[in-house]
């Protein structure tokens, strides 16, 4: 995932949190400086590849939540995910023994939902910062280096295994391409459409 995508999502999350800092109430008070520290240290999100490992390994307590509208969820969703559209998040119930992972198409709504849940006191909540774009780029169709070093072999083998597990196909980079490309070539909607055509 690119640094630009992380910074954009982080800025959005803090922008959503700012009104809580100005006029806190017992129901919505939130420690914005603490949130800012979490965002700065990347404690607010989890990489898509890590979430893929947790799904594959059936990590206890994992609760994967898709905050997109139901019609989008019904077209494509991550394995084991439940649909809680963002407007229904305030009424949802969560327990302390759950690890809640939020995602949306590109990450913006998941970041907003993360702020809402932090304001509500949910402890173990994170989001996939790049949303489905990261899932398609990093899990289903990871870009593999053309000439991997010996030290990369184990990581690449795992990426290939995860891609196959979830029905994807890795992409092979041309020489020099892996270092130059950190953004998808097309929009998220196109990636999703292509994956649907491939049956993912």
Please provide the spans of the model-predicted regions:
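Rhodanese-like catalytic fold shared by cysteine-dependent sulfurtransferases
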Residues: 1-49, 57-62, 70-99, 105-200
